Each structure stands twice: as C-alpha cells, then as structure tokens.
Amino acid sequence: MGAVADLKRRGYNPQPLRRVHIKKSNGKLRPLGIPTMKDRAMQALYLMALNPVAETTADRHSYGFRRERCTVDAIVQCHTILSKEVSPQWILEGDIKGCFDHISHEWLLNNIPMDKVMLRKWLKCGFVFNKELFPTEEGTPQGGIISPTLANITLDGLQTMLAEKYHKKFVNRKTIYYPKVHLVRYADDFIITGRSKEALEEIKPLAVSYTHLRA
C-alpha cells in the first residue's frame, strides 16, 4: 500500500533510464531504455487513462500492442484483402527503421492527449550507459510501458489519409474507379496494397512524408 500511495504527481521526477542492448535475430543489437520500477508503475497508471482515448482514434487495421489484437488478426486481415479474384495484385511493404528511437518529442508533446508535464519528464529523463548520463532528445524508450501506445498514436491516421484520397468513385451507382488501396499495420511494420505498381509508386512518397513528420 505504501508503494501505491507514493505514486503522486507532486514532486515526482523520473530517474534516468538504464540502457541495455539485446541481440536481434539478425545479430544486430537493439537498445532498450529500462525505467525504474516506480517509473514503470507511474507510466502504467497514466496508461490506464490514455489507452481508452487512443483506442477511439486508432487505425482500424492496426494490430500491434493493442488489447484483444495480435499477429493472427493481422494475418487474417491480409488474407481477407488478398484472397479474392479481384484482390489487388501489388503490395508495398514498409518497416519504419528505428521508429521508437526517432519519434519526434515535439510531435508527441503537441498531440498526445495526456498531462504534458509528466510526458515531458519521461521523454527528457535521459539514460545511463557505462555509468555515464546521456540526454534524450528524441524517441521514446522501447522498455517503457507507455511507449507502445505513444508509438501507435504517432503512426495512426495514415489509414484514414489513404482512404480519403484513394476511395471508390461511382457514377449512377456504378463503380468507375476502385484503387484497391488497403493498409494493414503491426507496430512499425505495414503493407499497403494497390491495383498497380504505378499506384504504389504514387502512394510511397505520401507514406514516407507522413511518417517522416512524426518519426
């Protein structure tokens, strides 16, 4: 009970993150920023309020780091889109390199619907590596409890943008244009479908520009 009562906003300042590296399947190292137990508990407390808000604006076909969703759901959606005779024949595959490490702090502070003072403290707390303190000027740590939700909010909206720009067009209730543009995203990995290579070549710079402004 004492630990719970200690989770107060007044006078709270997070400790610097502990930087560790884990080996990925390709042999490269992934940096993780590990908050203290108290800081993780405080993030979990604020995440309880942020998650329901994030769900109301989330992309419909975003499946990573969301409750009641998993990789199987993403696979099923891909099958639904691509298994028909009239399905799109072209796919643009995207992987936002170093997404967590390069998310714009300015964008987060301007757009995340939560206490900005607390968010700024978490983003700017720095990290310790080899007993040396380093500043954090961008990104949100992969070891943070709230980080996956922050990343999802950052990337949400791309599906809506594409749907508004590439939608079915009708004349006398007959479809005259069907671009077959669909987005399926799992965390920072996604695919975009299209009816032709030329269509995806047009879409690619839009997707790059959208993510570049945020991450």
Q: What kind of region is each of these model predictions?
A:
Residues 31-32:
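Conserved phosphate-binding loops in nucleotide/dinucleotide-binding enzymes
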Residues 6-10, 15-16, 20, 60-61, ...:
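Conserved polymerase palm-domain catalytic core
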Residues 48, 52-64:
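Charged boundary/loop elements
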Residues 24:
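Residues forming anionic-ligand binding surfaces in small-molecule and nucleic-acid pockets
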Residues 67-73:
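Active-site beta-loop-alpha junctions of metal-dependent nucleic acid enzymes
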Residues 211-215:
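Conserved small/polar residues in nucleotide/adenosyl-binding loops
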Residues 41-50, 150-151:
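Active/ligand-binding-proximal structured segments within catalytic/core domains
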